[in-house]
């Protein structure tokens, strides 16, 4: 199943309103997965209960695999994010892990008509997926009047992601699921700090995936 998308004039800064969900079916060969795709914001509060910002997320939660209902309580959940810093999670979603992908040969920029197909390599076959956009990227934003110095920075960023993950688990009642975090590029540096904050908050991780790990900035500086 494939679709064609053509760019249309729209407000590039328009923020989606309330949570939006749609039931879809992924199918490749004889395999099929019924799942609910949702887009929403997570309200992130600091320890003083002051709103830091709203973190945009896209989630894919399976309801049936090959026609058989799944037990959400035991199905893993993986929280995934790109790096930058300054990148939303669109590349790792539609370019790698999500149930849908944009067709590309990877050798040139895509034309204005984009073909989107079921992704045969999606991790949805093994785990539910939640893609998180860091505050200030994608449709995530820092709350009006909130000091951005308390949000931007390695430690600050990781704390915000920790609060977002806890918020999502609370809202979806998934504390019994095996939990994973999946970071790419700078996202691996985030993960290295995030796993500590999650541990201190009592969030048990079943595993951490580091894609294109990037821990030492000095290796990429001129003269090194």
Q: What is each PLM-predicted segment?
A:
Residues 2-7, 49-150:
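N-terminal cap/lid subdomain of alpha/beta-hydrolase-fold enzymes
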Residues 14-66:
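N-terminal cap/lid segment of alpha/beta-hydrolase-fold proteins
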Residues 63, 167, 171, 197-201:
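Active-site catalytic microenvironments for nucleophilic, acid-base chemistry
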Residues 99-103, 195-224:
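A catalytic-pocket lid/entrance helix-loop region that shapes and gates access to the active site
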Residues 133, 180, 207-209:
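Residue in the alpha/beta-hydrolase core beta-strand immediately N-terminal to the catalytic nucleophile
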Residues 173-186:
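Alpha/beta-hydrolase fold nucleophile elbow
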